[in-house]
Amino acid sequence: MIQARNKLSQEELSEAKKLINCCQNYDGTYRDPYLSNMLNFDPNMPAFFLYYEKGELVGLLTVYADDQDVEVTILVHPDHRRQGIARALFTSFEKETASFSICSVTFQTERIFLERHPDFVNNWGLVEDEETETWLGKDRRPYPLANVSNLEVLLADSSYQEQISQLKFQAFSEEHESREVVDRYVAEALKDPESRLYILLKDGQVIGTCTVDLSTNTNYFYGLAISEPERGKGYGSYLAKFLVNQLIEQNDKEFQIAVEDSNVGAKHLYEKIGFVKQTQVVYLNEKGARDSEV
């Protein structure tokens, strides 16, 4: 039985996390799908499809849709694979979201999963995208970090919203993020009890920002950005190190960060400060859709 939801209840969230954990342990994967519809372009669109068998959640499809080019992740319990559950979930997703203005669908998976399931791409008629992403992890060892008198890291509030949006838009506009999407990210991060939006001030001016997602079993850093004129001066690593040290005192989680493989500089920075590669996230497009764009 498949149930479609635009938002998960606490019980469903708990079941989903249990299934994700089970699949990760079995497959050797690391990436947690996003279990909120907070950033989706239409909050009414079904974003979670749950497949139950005898009262147990054995399949999950999640939809990440900050714009009309949506990303889908499908997870099936190891004991229930090759029974058509993934297909059934995707068919349900197509049917339930047909009335919403979706332009394209991209599947998210991990390199290790594709290596262990080499027929998956062909069986589903998919083609691998050139863009890939590396997820890196770090243990709870703190950094030796001296205070710098003219630098300050603060938990942001709404008075900084415009400055943060402007900085993020300049940093990430090449990733085809519209200003509207960036504004939504910032506004929701400020509201979300599971997020912490930090800013780095230099002489009182916002020169950096980073969001920490606390909703999974790691402190997940994303959207770390330094303003253009201040790059290459060590401020990115200072902000990351400061946040690691602070969060070690606040919770008992380890750390994760994701970076596009094309962003060689950022990847090098994270590796230099002790983050270690966990997995490569791969994006798969439907063949027809990809061909029609070319």
Enumerate the predicted regions with their spans.
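Short amphipathic alpha-helix that is part of the acyltransferase structural core
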Residues: 1-35, 146-177
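C-terminal "cap" of GNAT-fold acetyltransferases
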Residues: 130-160, 253, 258-264, 279-294
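Conserved donor-binding loop and adjoining core beta-sheet/short helix segment
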Residues: 24, 32-97, 110-111, 210-219
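A short, internal acetyl-CoA/4′-phosphopantetheine-binding micro-motif in the GNAT/acyltransferase core
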Residues: 73-83, 224-232, 260
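Acyl-donor-binding surface of acyltransferase catalytic domains
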Residues: 67, 78-149, 284-286
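Conserved acetyl-CoA-binding loop-helix of GNAT-fold acetyltransferases
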Residues: 82-95, 226, 232-249, 267-272
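Active-site rim helix/loop that mediates acceptor-substrate recognition in acyltransferases
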Residues: 24-53, 175-211
